[in-house]
Amino acid sequence: MKKTGILNSDISRVVADMGHMDWLGIGDAGTPVPKTTEKIDLAVSAGMPSFISVLKEVLKELQVQKIYVADEIKDSNPKQLENIKRILPDVEIKFIPHTQLKKNLSEAKAFIRTGEETPFSNVILESGVIF
């Protein structure tokens, strides 16, 4: 049995397979996931697990150089945006329309669905390199 880090075998596999500039999505329970993108469904109930708790765990194992966030989060969920900025202080944030973010998920290796039920709690992580 794995002792530390991400215990979910699907997330662990996807993170280990990420190359430079690959994309991984994490988001709320209502995010539509393209049929071409692997969906890793962690949602248990409303709010469980939270978007931020899953994001924090993934960031312990994945080097990220840029994130894509829906522009609408600025007005509709500024608290969540502040949470994202706080845990990714040195990572470039690119704001794009929510419709574009949803389309871009078709290019992601996978999407992790959380139990989050707050608007625009979605992010696409672009992997970096550790050297």
Swiss-Prot record:
The active site is at 20 (proton donor). It catalyses: beta-D-ribopyranose = beta-D-ribofuranose. GO terms for biological process: D-ribose catabolic process. It holds the Pfam family RbsD_FucU. SUPFAM superfamilies: RbsD-like. Keywords: Carbohydrate metabolism, Cytoplasm, Isomerase. Belongs to the RbsD / FucU family. RbsD subfamily. The keyword rRNA processing does not apply. Its EC number is 5.4.99.62. Gene3D superfamilies: RbsD-like domain (3.40.1650.10). It comes from Lactobacillus acidophilus (strain ATCC 700396 / NCK56 / N2 / NCFM). Substrate binds at residues 28, 98, 120-122. The keyword Isomerase applies. It is an enzyme of class 5 (isomerase). It is found in: Cytoplasm. Pathway: Carbohydrate metabolism; D-ribose degradation; D-ribose 5-phosphate from beta-D-ribopyranose: step 1/2. This is D-ribose pyranase. Catalyzes the interconversion of beta-pyran and beta-furan forms of D-ribose. PANTHER family: D-RIBOSE PYRANASE. GO terms for cellular component: cytosol. InterPro entries: D-ribose_pyranase, RbsD-like_sf, RbsD_FucU. One of its GO terms (molecular function) is intramolecular lyase activity.
